[in-house]
Amino acid sequence: LLTIANRILGTGQLSLAKFLWITADDTHHLHSNDIAGYFKYVLQRIDFSRDLHFYSNTTIDTLDYSGTGLNSGSKVVFAAYGDIKRELATALPELFHTNSLITHAAMVMPGIAVVQINPFTHYDNASAEIHNLENHFASQTECLQNLPLIVIADDAAFTAQSLHNFLWVTFTRCNPSHDIYGVRSFTQHKHWGCHGPLMMDARVKPHHAPALEKDEAIERSIDP
């Protein structure tokens, strides 16, 4: 899988990707066009202590420029294959309602939760906030065995409203090397991983481009 992943990231405009989820299905029933099914398949099998592979300090741009400057950024490969390791949770555990930082939480789909906390200010503050959440979740990891992915967002309700919203928020507002954290994380022989859920900080950052929104006056002027 990693050989193919490197081929993908080294091919033309595919090199602009910053998140690559790659797996294999011996039954040939899995299709990447079935996004929900694809996420389910990978999240049932992935081992975040082993299956994350980062590319940091790259000089390769990404299409959304979520890094801190041009010709700088990072990438990550999620490579999972094998037997099912978990059945994905469909409801939020109670501990999502017992942390003062979390103002709202919701399920996006089985195995993926989103939490809303204060807006992002700077990375030092974000590190302290995420450390608070990591410690909170680490105290009850048995409740999170079937909830492998937690997204941190500015608007949890919007993010969980649809798969489209989840994809847009999570993967355009997250720089892998800066914004991925994990419960019970570790670094061993240059490899980073975590023994609990993966946490992705998908809040808007100060260096992000402003949202492109419709101008209501212009919209009315072109309405038939």
Where are these regions (language model features)?
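Charged, compositionally biased interaction regions
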Residues: 1-224
